[in-house]
């Protein structure tokens, strides 16, 4: 975490943790080396490009300066010859009207490769500089580096009058790396500092993820832009593809592809994470993993992002059969398919999307890759079109024809309810579905893309008064949907009389068994806000949009706390409206009750005495009645105190009385 800068009369008088320096004696010394940095400098006085003026940042003269011709991804530093552990840095801005602001959010990096592909941050300047004065900051990084540099924030032309490094020679240790905040720091270092510029071209890079003072991930990769409308924002979203599969942080999947969601229009920076938590409380079989992170690209601080699963067929993600080109007949041809009802499908390459036969619903084939073979393409197109035909027929279970035979209605309802509770205008603009091999049923999920949900869309704001308690959001003229998809949803939710009880059952079970309430979700929101607090401050220094309308923002709240409170207030109203619309029943539960008076076995769970175990060694979780996690794993629990517990497995939930 960063420390505030300090003004110093004499930077030599300070104490290193664990080592006391006598008065007037430095425990680490001011370092010298060969000045390095961006070659093309700029002379403001003569309005011209000048070469190799890096030395001006180290000449001890606050009246000279280093500046670059290029506006972004420019830097200046030292080649120290050998690795040094840096203990302190000093800086002073160029004497200019914008000088003090141009050093703010500047990142100090260390590296041991001349190309800086292994660069990591060792300090971040979080305050404006002072013209004519040196400011100093203590560095908390145990690793030694040969190359050190200052990288200015974007569009600042690396304007700096003086730069100083203090430290001592040594390789250092790998147990004390610096992070920008308490969140993980993701460092993307591309070859030749190339910036990703579109969705088609992958830029080779190295990705380093720092968490809790250690390197979590350090691997070769490529990076490109991702997304559709989100790509139009100045804060760009990216996709990372590692050369080899990686385990990242606490994500359940080992995979090559990962996304960095920019959350530009979401001033809480948490809406996607909140929606994913709601999906988990609805017990959806796969909810994308996500984690808030700070991102640095080629030394430039880019803001707070969400590192997230690439939604794809992969163990630990959408765990269905991955098809091969030779899977063109018999049972092999039946799956697995991962598709997206997609309003943007028309922009995809030919052969990777289709429109359904009867109502022209646009569908993109996400897996198999490139739309698959002709046989695979034809199979899933025809299968989806048959489902569509059955949904729009009037024979719901009559004459032996029922769309429910090939469509998982429960998964569709769970997906719909996440969209309704979150107030997601775009629920049916983009809707994922999948079909596995040997399974006749198409399932709905996973959920995705909630940056304009939770009262963040001027087309529907305020949902409480404009949608109310007598209809669903997706039914209204305000909601957006891919062609034909809103009618598809209406047929299932409104025309099929069985769905009303299904919705009531699924909603009530989630409310009663899975801590789905305004109170408990707002506690989760508060926890996210606390976790994000340091990072959001830096993010909105980098992107000063808090008092601007961006994307679909309906109102300007003015500060982070009020943005968060608006989400919490919305949840209270939305639960009230949906409880009335759905007919919430507090007596409906899916939890089976068993006691430990004698050994009991239900759904693979064995209760013996005051211990709980899984017969098959499967993962299960034990919660107290207050919702606190007591145990998670596949082994036998320790002896539990007498009381009531909720045990959750992939097969369901149960109440255990010990």
Model-assigned labels for residue ranges:
Residues 28-81, 94-101, 127, 169-173:
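Disordered, acidic Ser/Thr/Pro-rich linker "stalks" and the adjacent N-terminal cap
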Residues 70-74, 97-169:
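Trp- and acidic/polar-enriched beta-sheet ligand-binding modules for extracellular glycan
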Residues 72-73, 81-90, 144-145, 255:
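Extended extracellular/luminal ectodomain segments enriched in beta-structured repeat modules
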Residues 84-97, 150:
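A short beta-strand element within beta-rich, extracytoplasmic domains
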Residues 196, 219-220, 229, 233-234, ...:
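Middle-to-C-terminal accessory/interaction subdomains
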Residues 205-262:
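Conserved oxyanion/phosphate-binding beta-strand-loop segments in alpha/beta enzyme cores
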Residues 241, 246-247, 255, 262-263, ...:
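Internal "kinase-insert"/substrate-recognition segments embedded within catalytic cores
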Residues 594-658:
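C-terminal outer-membrane/trafficking sorting elements
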